């Protein structure tokens, strides 16, 4: 279910403040964040945001097609190792 239009999209205050300061200074720095639930807003376009996936921060360059998606969508948390080749114990 989508978020109500009466409410604004959720963006962590510390991340938004950092992005606004960088936009004023016209600088490009990597912004480190743990807030995977934050929604990408148009002010973030062109910045690189390092999103935590539980183990490390993955750098994500924000483009215009990413607007209205969450930061966590672009930082996968699970690494699929593949199915076991010869697992005869589980068949019994």
From Swiss-Prot:
Keyword presence, Repressor: no
Biological process annotations from GO: ribosomal small subunit assembly; translation
Key words, A-Z: Chloroplast, Plastid, Ribonucleoprotein, Ribosomal protein, RNA-binding, rRNA-binding
SUPFAM superfamilies for this protein: Ribosomal protein S19 (SSF54570)
Cell location: Plastid, Chloroplast
GO CC, any one term: chloroplast
InterPro entries from the UniProt entry: Ribosomal_uS19 (IPR002222), Ribosomal_uS19_bac-type (IPR005732), Ribosomal_uS19_CS (IPR020934), Ribosomal_uS19_SF (IPR023575)
This protein's record includes keyword Chloroplast: yes
Any one GO MF annotation of this record: rRNA binding
UniProt-listed Pfam families: Ribosomal_S19
Coiled-coil residues: none
HAMAP family: Ribosomal_uS19
Primary role: Protein S19 forms a complex with S13 that binds strongly to the 16S ribosomal RNA.
Family: Belongs to the universal ribosomal protein uS19 family.
Protein name: Small ribosomal subunit protein uS19c
Native organism: Picea abies
